[in-house]
Design a protein with these regions (language model features):
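Ligand/cofactor-recognition surfaces for anionic moieties
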Residues: 1-449
């Protein structure tokens, strides 16, 4: 770590003290709180303030460890982040001892990723830049995001004087900083550049999608449960669990940006998808095919054996299947069919074409450069779109699950069989980027026809 990471507690504590005193000036001014009462309350909140500050000191090194773990996979996006910061006049590589483009090209050739101190610099600049972008947007004004104030301040003040938070004169700044820090801590330094390059979305839209994914999937509680495994399971395994949540986060942010209207506020979107995702999770036992059920049981057993509590292990073992949950909710919305029927049909279609094997293998495809990464993400998105559209037309026939797939296949057997065999061959022959693109094209053509 850099000194800025290891010694951030002092700055955080000072900021918290100032913001607490500003908040308490409201009840102090209207007579609900005396000066002695204010001082007593500040003293009472000392431990809570310390815990909140230490929490930030926990999350920043964790963000760096996750970025380190990604290694060369994220190299292109990290280089793009540097270039973007330079163009905006926010970063001087020489001042921050960051490599120039020629040095980065040599590092790429040698497969040498960014060092931890370099990632720490990028983390700081990513947060500062995102904070600026969010303050210039309407994101901090979304009523749903007022809950970020409750995450920032100690519970005592949030419970006793909620209006002091709502009318805090730095309300927008605190929301923007709290949300932006959460985004970079959980998504990595190159989060904004990565998602923007894949979708063309502005930072404000990415922030809204981040909040929607985080809260729809209950990721805060999930990450907190993983935090509780400190010194109970091997550190490497714990980092793998955080990375699994991060993978889901990054993937579904893109999905929400492409498939959900976030312009009318987050409250209804989060409520709808949170309930829908919970319904999909509840339906998994009856919707997944035997191979998927066996793989899920094996994942859970392995985690429990390593020391992960059974309930948490079960939730984590569901994540690969829950990646599809927003697609299933969307198909249910468009067809009017129950979540359970749509889930069964969606997974049956995936099993018929072996799409689960393809999407799983896609994460292991070697990526040579930044453009390979974009091509991979585009192909995966195309396959996801095809699977969603297949499920919609299949479930529309009145059946569900394997029966719905069979009913849809029957009148178009020859064409479907040709595509199915080709996709199976791709799934069984060692997946490459070009093969993934071919599979995406075949499935896309099938849906169009």
């Amino acid at each position: 770590n850099t000194d800025a990471i290891d010694n951030s507690a002092g700055v955080n504590t000072s900021d918290m003290e100032v913001n607490l005193k500003i908040a308490l000036s409201i009840p102090l001014r209207d007579g609900r709180l005396t000066m002695d009462g204010r001082n007593a309350l500040l003293a009472e909140m000392t431990d809570d303030v310390a815990a909140l500050v230490l929490r930030n000191n926990y999350l920043q090194p964790l963000a760096l460890s996750l970025a380190e773990r990604r290694g060369m996979e994220a190299f292109g996006f990290q280089q793009r982040l540097i270039q973007t910061l330079e163009k905006r006049g926010h970063l001087d590589r020489a001042v921050e001892f960051l490599p120039d483009d020629a040095q980065l090209a040599e590092r790429r050739r040698r497969a040498e990723p960014f060092t931890r101190p370099e990632l720490a610099v990028l983390l700081a600049y990513a947060k500062l830049t995102l904070d600026e972008d969010l303050l210039e947007s309407a994101v901090p004004d979304d009523p749903y995001l007022a809950r970020e104030l409750g995450r920032y301040f100690p519970k005592a003040i949030a419970e006793r004087f909620p209006d002091a938070l709502e009318h805090h004169r730095l309300r927008r700044e605190i929301i923007a900083t709290q949300l932006g820090n959460s985004m970079i801590n959980r998504g990595g330094p190159s989060l904004i550049v990565r998602i923007a390059d894949q979708t063309g979305a502005a930072p404000a839209a990415i922030a809204a999608a981040f909040a929607a994914v985080r809260d729809s999937f209950g990721m805060t509680a999930l990450n907190t449960a993983i935090d509780g495994l400190d010194n109970r399971i091997p550190g490497k395994l714990q980092l793998e669990l955080y990375a699994a949540v991060q993978d889901l986060l990054l993937d579904r942010i893109i999905w929400f940006l492409r498939n959900v209207d976030l312009s009318k506020g987050l409250a209804d979107v989060v409520a709808h998808y949170r309930d829908g995702i919970a319904a999909v999770e509840a339906a998994l036992d009856g919707a997944l095919f035997e191979d998927s059920l066996s793989a899920r049981a094996a994942r859970k057993a392995k985690l429990v054996e390593a020391g992960v509590p059974a309930e948490l292990a079960g939730r984590l073992s569901n994540l690969p299947s829950l990646t599809a949950a927003p697609d299933i909710v969307l198909v249910a919305d468009r067809t009017g069919k129950p979540i359970g029927e749509v889930a069964a049909t969606y997974f049956a279609a995936g099993a018929f074409f072996r799409l689960d094997r393809i999407t799983s293998a896609a994460s292991n495809i070697p990526i040579a450069d930044y453009f390979d990464r974009l091509a991979l993400d585009r192909a995966r998105d195309s396959i996801g779109d095809a699977e969603r559209r297949l499920a919609a037309v299949m479930v529309g026939n009145g059946a569900a699950g394997a029966a719905a797939v069979a009913a849809w296949v029957k009148p178009r057997h020859d064409e479907v069989e040709r595509v199915r065999l080709a996709v199976h061959e791709i799934a069984n022959s060692g997946l490459t980027l070009s093969k993934l693109a071919v599979a995406a094209s075949l499935l896309g053509d099938l849906v169009k026809n």
